[in-house]
Curated annotation (Swiss-Prot):
GO terms for biological process: mRNA processing. Residues 238-255 have a biased composition (Basic residues). This is mRNA 3'-end-processing protein YTH1. It is found in: Nucleus. A zinc finger (C3H1-type) spans 37-64, 73-100, 101-129, 130-157, 159-182.
Amino acid sequence: MPSAVESPADAILNHSATSYNFRFSPFLRQTYQVGLSPDRPVCKAFQSGHCPNGTRCPERHVSDSKTSQPTGGLNSLVCKHWLRGLCKKGEHCEFLHEYNLRKMPECNFFMRNGYCSNGDECLYLHIDPQSRLPPCPHYDMGFCPLGPNCSKKHVRRKLCVFYLAGFCPDGPDCKEGAHPKWSKDLEKPTLKSEEKKDEEMRVEFSQDDMDRQRDQQRDRDRDDGGRHRGGHGGHGGHGGRGKWRGRGRYRARGH
């Protein structure tokens, strides 16, 4: 029989790293639990309060989430020292010691702007904006007049042949396909361009407000600067009504 060829997707998802053994590996394993299986059982003695084996315990020492202090969501970030193999905290590290893209937090830059300057090398999750769109109720019933120009998502589903014939004995528990429901009070479908125009108008209005506030601030700064300069006057610092003479003496008009 021909040997099964592993697909690239399986090689990525089911990747097994090559294990290396060094002279200091036993020390790291006993002191920091480095290299131990993350799926090993949890130590019940440690959870009850004290484990006599300490760091030499072959089981996991996991603190109770109810008694441990909150980490502020840091356990969803990958430990940068662990990526380089230099983390000394081991299982007690508040960061994630696992490189799993499904557990990465969402990239805020990609979410706001629709692109990321780091591209495929970004360590955070890039979610397609199309996946956030709600499903089109007209398409779910069987037909959307706007077709691919609809602003909502068109999800293809297999229809139940028994439901199309008039009756499905399994009802809502049917596994043969979807049961489209008819409704007469649906909102009119909208085009993609209309939603884009509304979004562009909102962005333009916000930009105009920022420009207006910037201009007002510039005018206030200019008025304040002119008021300070006018208060001291031009010549002599007294509105031009006198002259300074030698040795600090001041001679006003008429003297």
